[in-house]
Amino acid sequence: MPTAVHAPYDSAELAHAADVMVTDQMWVKPGHNVLITADTATDPVGVEAVLRAITRAGAKGGVFTIPQLPFQGMLADPYVPESLGAAVVKSDAWIDLTFPYLAGSHIHDEALKGGRTRYLLALDIGAGGIVRLYGRGDLDKIYAVQSALDALLVKARGKTCRITTELGTDVTCVLDKPGYIKPRRANKPGLYSPPGGSVLFPVVESVKGTIVVEAAFHEYYAIFDKPCVLTVDGRIRKVSGGGPERKVMERALRRAGGGEFGYVIHFTHGMHPAARMTHTSFEEATRVAGNDAIGLGTPFWMPGGGENHPDGLMSMQSVWVDGVRIVRDGDIVGPPKLAKLAAALTPVYR
């Protein structure tokens, strides 16, 4: 994955992008209580931009900064201040810029059970990521593609899916019922994520083949010196390659899998026309066109599962569903209606 060159942005562009995040996607209205969670590694420029956007929306915003967590999800519970739990349940909208993140933790679950909070799992996107994901993409067009691909995957439940890459990935699975959907706007309580990615949920026991990842979020976001190879036959049976990061990957897999390597929980497909491989943001990397963030470990519907799994990352994937190619080397090529929508995606130049 080569390092990309990025255009600079000015304060006006950042302000516009933060407004899109806050008022367009997260549906923040005057009088709403909005919480930003950040950690000691979060980009402060991005945090301030989002806070200012909340103020411009006429809402009441605040920032709760914690030390960077060692793990995400329920594994973060011992490290999360109780006072933060009191704040999230009183929030109409919660924008989480921590990484590792709070989704799947006890306070996150309590907030969603309360039926009030709209939660954005924004992770580590920073100011530059906010500009690219929210300011340099037409969200209506992006969600048109995302929703069409999601609908295709819903209809394909029970069909065989095959995914390959030039680096050697060749894996098949049976598609399962989607675990969740990603609506255009956060106008109801629940979990939301930045635009530009669809999720493919396999029947976990059906996944078979070889997965070659170039990067991962295990305990942190790491680019591998050498590709890491996962051999899968129902469960993940073997991990090889990966250079010095392999030990961290194996440790994270066993932690999330209850001592075993666990399963492949999900595949994804990135489609955001302005997302870039910065090597500083895992979340933005998952939105790059053709990238696939592969969830590994134990799914949330099994004991001990949840948002505590590591993710592998691979690029330029090709995807077949029921023998029909829908993605070629990262580009959506079918069916014709979906391919036409995808071909219209271009960055917004300001």
Segments from the language model and where they lie:
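Active-site proximal loops enriched in glycine and acidic residues that flank catalytic Cys/His/Asp
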Residues: 38, 213-215, 232, 240-243, ...
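Internal helix-turn-beta structural module
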Residues: 279-349
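Detector for methionine-enriched segments
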Residues: 1, 21, 26, 74, ...
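Dual-mode signal for accessory low-complexity, basic/Gly-rich regions
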Residues: 238-296, 300-303
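Active-site bordering "gate/hinge" segments
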Residues: 1-225, 233, 247, 258, ...
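Active-site and channel-lining beta-strand-loop segments
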Residues: 225-240, 319
